[in-house]
Swiss-Prot record:
Name of the protein described by the UniProt record: Bifunctional purine biosynthesis protein PurH
Alphabetized Pfam families for the sequence: AICARFT_IMPCHas, MGS
Domain notes: The IMP cyclohydrolase activity resides in the N-terminal region.
Catalytic function, reaction form: (6R)-10-formyltetrahydrofolate + 5-amino-1-(5-phospho-beta-D-ribosyl)imidazole-4-carboxamide = 5-formamido-1-(5-phospho-D-ribosyl)imidazole-4-carboxamide + (6S)-5,6,7,8-tetrahydrofolate; IMP + H2O = 5-formamido-1-(5-phospho-D-ribosyl)imidazole-4-carboxamide
Organism: Mycobacterium marinum (strain ATCC BAA-535 / M)
């Protein structure tokens, strides 16, 4: 028969907390229920200051707190009381022989290590906030959950008092508390280990990739389903990470879906790939349109939508600047799943929230740098995020392979086309006119098909436009598809064994061809 439902009365509690939130109410409640309280340092002082009976830990151990408080509870008379399995008669006999009393409750929270690091404190100050005794007590109590309940979060204090009044926690409840406690110390240890690793020279100075890395992921939301209705899904966030889309504030609309998040992330990154006012419209993680404008964000949105209005239906929109009332008015006429921006004009927000189904998000600007992680079977791939910071992303470093140098307007469009390529799944061809994509060929397994798709999408607008390819043309056919449609200038990385043939085809067509020397695959 299961004993999970049997309650173990709480007669003695050990309390040692840095965060004093709710401490006095907890101590008063425990005392009123007849629970003896043993405590340490400032925790004991806070409890005693309210006239609540408390036994200081040094009275228990017969050993003073020493080394500026580094040693308080690291003593056999404390840990024997935490680790004794009261189901074991030999353990009970050992306690009696030693004159040690067991604890049935441990309430501990830890020094604020992560907050200290984030504050910019010195190395020595951070080291002082690495808790030793606290995690030791938490882990001991969690290990011994058949006999001890452990609580590490002040939000759990009401549950403690409720359990005390009901005869104690059940074994099932202590197991749950132990699980939470081990999660707490694991998060703490990851934070300490990650910081400590960052303070020492890497084993391989030529790489930014550590031998070990850890992350703290907390479930932030359950999602309705995953990519498909038969798949379950959830959103996780790293509390210590730079605020991003996972921390976006939703101002309006129904809950976000898995696909909403993936498309919004792609759109958000695409919009911030450009310095001018930019709007990106994404569907299935690929652009329906991207555009920039020196005039207004509404103008950028109009141009982005015009790239592929059919595909933009039900898409996700991202802006790198405040959404204006004019843009919001246009967006409200189109079925849109999500719009995300750093800010909204009040009138724009009023307009958008009249639409029942659109999800309106405010998010912080994406952080530069960082790493991308991709799970694979049995492992994880890590790479530096593609931030358009390669040497070839600067047009000053481009090589003119053939044709006349581009005039300023043409060069501006070429740069925009090149930067927009990063947001398109490979193989990618982007055709641009007047700061807007007009034809996008994406996700094709050969480059000539990507060129054909981009030309088909662009139609008559392609004549006189410019184009970019995210990787080199392996054969002249892709470039010839573009020039036959009227593209006047092209930028691509170069590097193919057939570069001379490709350049010759460009010269024959009389167009301008630039080489970047950098590639922007996206898979």
């Amino acid at each position: 028969m299961s004993t999970d439902h049997i309650r173990r009365p709480i007669r003695r509690a050990l309390i040692s907390v840095y965060d004093k939130t709710g401490l006095v109410d907890l101590a008063q409640g425990l005392t009123a229920a007849g629970v003896e309280i043993v405590s340490t340092g400032s925790t004991a002082k806070t409890i005693a200051s309210k006239g609540i009976p408390v036994t200081r830990v040094e009275e228990l151990t017969g050993f003073p707190e020493v080394l500026d408080g580094r040693v308080k509870t690291l003593h056999p008379r404390v840990h024997a009381g935490l680790l004794a399995d009261l189901r074991n008669p030999e353990h009970e006999a050992a306690l009696a022989e030693l004159g040690v009393e067991a604890f049935e409750l441990v309430v501990v929270n830890l020094y604020p290590f992560s907050q200290t690091v984030e504050s910019g404190a010195s190395v020595d100050e951070c080291v002082e906030q690495i808790d030793i005794g606290g995690p030791s007590m938490v882990r001991a109590a969690a290990k011994n959950h058949p006999s001890v309940a452990v609580v590490t979060d002040p939000q759990g204090y009401d549950g403690v008092l409720a359990a005390v009044s009901s005869g104690g926690f059940t074994l099932a409840e202590r197991k749950k508390l132990a699980s939470l406690a081990f999660q707490h110390t694991a998060e703490y240890d990851i934070a300490v280990a990650s910081w400590m690793q960052s303070t020492v020279a890497p084993e391989q100075p030529e790489t930014d990739f550590p031998r070990w890395f850890g992350r703290n992921w907390r479930r932030q939301a359950m999602l309705r389903y995953g990519e498909n209705p038969h798949q379950q899904a959830a959103l996780y966030a790293d509390p210590g990470a730079w605020p991003g889309l996972a921390q976006a504030e939703q101002l309006h609309g129904k809950e976000m879906s898995y696909n909403n998040f993936t498309d919004a992330d792609a759109a958000w990154r695409a919009a911030f790939d450009h310095e001018q006012k930019c709007v990106a419209i994404i569907k299935h993680a690929n652009p329906c349109g991207i555009a920039i404008s020196e005039v207004s964000v509404a103008d950028a949105h109009r141009k982005a939508h015009a790239c592929d209005p059919l595909s933009a239906y039900g898409g996700v929109i991202a802006c790198n600047t405040e959404v204006s009332p004019e843009m919001a008015e246009y967006v409200s006429t189109i079925f849109t799943e999500v719009i995300v921006a750093p800010a909204y004009a009040p009138a724009a927000l009023d307009q958008l929230t009249k639409k029942k189904n659109i999800r309106v998000l405010v998010a912080s600007e994406p952080q530069d740098g960082g790493a991308e992680l991709r799970p694979i079977s049995g492992g994880l791939l890590m790479q530096q995020r593609d931030q358009l910071d390669a040497a070839g992303d600067n047009p000053a470093n481009w090589t003119l392979a053939t044709g006349s140098p581009a005039d300023p307007a043409t060069l501006t469009d070429l740069v925009f086309a090149w930067r927009s390529c990063r947001a398109v799944k490979s193989n990618a061809i982007v055709i641009v006119a007047d700061g807007a994509t007009i034809g996008v060929g994406m996700g094709q397994v050969n480059r000539v098909d990507a060129a054909r798709l981009a030309v088909e999408r662009g139609g008559e607008r392609v004549n006189g436009a410019v184009a970019a390819s995210d990787a080199f043309f392996p054969f002249p056919d892709g470039l010839e598809t573009l020039t036959a449609a009227g593209v006047k200038a092209i930028v691509h990385p170069g590097g193919s064994v057939r570069d001379e043939e490709v350049t010759a085809a460009a010269a024959k067509a009389g167009i301008t061809l630039y080489l970047t020397g950098s590639r922007h695959f996206a898979h």
